[in-house]
Amino acid sequence: MKVELVRVNDAFHFEGSGSSEVKVHTDGSPDIGGSNLGVRPMELLLMGLASCSAIDVVLILKKQRQDITDFRIITEGDREEEPDTKRKPFRKIHLLFKFAGNQLDENKINRAIALSMEKYCSATAQMEALATITYSVEIASV
């Protein structure tokens, strides 16, 4: 896998792309001179983790003919400053999977999430080496 990052302005706005050729914009926070023209890099890590699992879960549940009308993942990461550095990596990450739909099978949803988190999602495999990753589920009937 290969990605390219290109500086867009004279501050901290960058445009990234990979083999999909879709552009993603990142930027620094305003307190360091950023302009809010893109997501923060650490936000992008959490989005990548959630997206990876979301794709797995939707793929599995489509095969099981679950009628999902709304699906979102709210992801929160707790960061901890490392001694003698300015780095603050994630140490705890929690994903809240929220579903709405018609006659959703709770067991199928829980199994799909477990398969993603424990077997399929490469982003989870990458990040769980450095952070404790947990998840919970909310299901609403429509």
Describe the function of each predicted region.
Residues 1-47, 58-142:
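Extended beta-strand/beta-hairpin segments
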